[in-house]
Amino acid sequence: GKLIKSLNDKHYVIGVSSYDYDEFRTNNDRIVMGAGHGYKILRTEKQKASIENSIAYLLANSNNEPIVRSSVWYAYNVSKRIAFTNKMLWESGDDDYLRNETSFDYSLTEKVTIGLKNTYTKDPIEYNIFNITLGVKF
């Protein structure tokens, strides 16, 4: 999860925490907690982009260490119904962690969305996960 506190139109501070489990990774469990700064690079009616950098602490099965995190997020509303999003996260450490998530979503109605999503992860094992998604707003 992430907490965001705006400082002005462009700058904000963040508090981050995450839990990740992967049975194929040497360190099955990853818990990250930290704080940092975000900057809104671009904000238009159709496009949004942000970059965030933070200092965090990683708790993992075999090693606990301070890390640096950096993420870039970009969203483009191609039309009223079609949206493209890309989120990239890098974390330093004994084993660097990289995750890039790319998705295309199509709104069937105001409350129902279908989409295609690919998540690439390297930690240090590389793999891709492709999903067909269904989203429902309540």
Regions found by a protein language model. Give the residues of each.
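Outer-membrane beta-barrel "beta-signal"
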Residues: 105-107, 126-138
